UniProtKB/Swiss-Prot annotation:
One example GO MF annotation: arachidonate binding
Membrane spanning stretches: 9-30, 53-77, 81-102, 116-128
Stretches assigned to the Cytoplasmic side: 31-52, 103-107
Protein's UniProt name: Arachidonate 5-lipoxygenase-activating protein
Record's bilayer topology term: Multi-pass membrane protein
Length: 153
């Protein structure tokens, strides 16, 4: 890959790698809680603490593909910097959700709701990028400069 191409995706790649580390952390928590309860083997049933850790991890895993698609779509189609920032915010919120789910479940609700809003923001960025592509294609008008001006301020 040439330097310009790497420069266009490096922030997205960094956020993706951080998300992989976070997934590893969540999986480690599930494994640790399982071994604490069941000795050396992994079981899907156990105490309330294990059920909470396992459910929180599954909820995060279920939303992960959607997050990755929205992150990369928004970054490639619209603008890398705000997409990467939104991705970092999503990872922070997902961490808050995971930790909140381990305590009282109502503590996880703000993280869940804010995470949905971040996914919506990334979706709207992707739509703006697609809309801009068709504006250029049909009308020759490029709104990407306007979008970049708004997102860099």
């Amino acid at each position: 890959m040439d330097q310009e191409t790497v420069g266009n995706v490096v922030l997205l790649a960094i956020v993706t790698l951080i998300s992989v580390i976070q997934n590893g952390f969540f999986a480690h928590k599930v494994e640790h809680e399982s071994k604490t309860q069941n000795g050396r083997s992994f079981q899907r049933t156990g105490t309330l603490a294990f059920e909470r850790v396992y459910t929180a991890n599954q909820n995060c895993v279920d939303a992960y593909p959607t997050f990755l698609v929205m992150l990369w779509s928004a970054g490639l189609l619209c603008s890398q910097v705000p997409a990467a920032f939104a991705g970092l915010m999503y990872l922070f919120v997902r961490q808050k959700y995971f930790v909140g789910y381990l305590g009282e479940r109502r503590q996880s609700t703000p993280g869940y709701i804010f995470g949905k809003r971040i996914i919506l923001f990334l979706f709207l960025m992707s739509l703006a990028g697609i809309f801009n592509y068709y504006l250029i294609l049909f009308f020759g008008s490029d709104f990407e400069n306007y979008i970049k001006t708004i997102t860099t301020t």
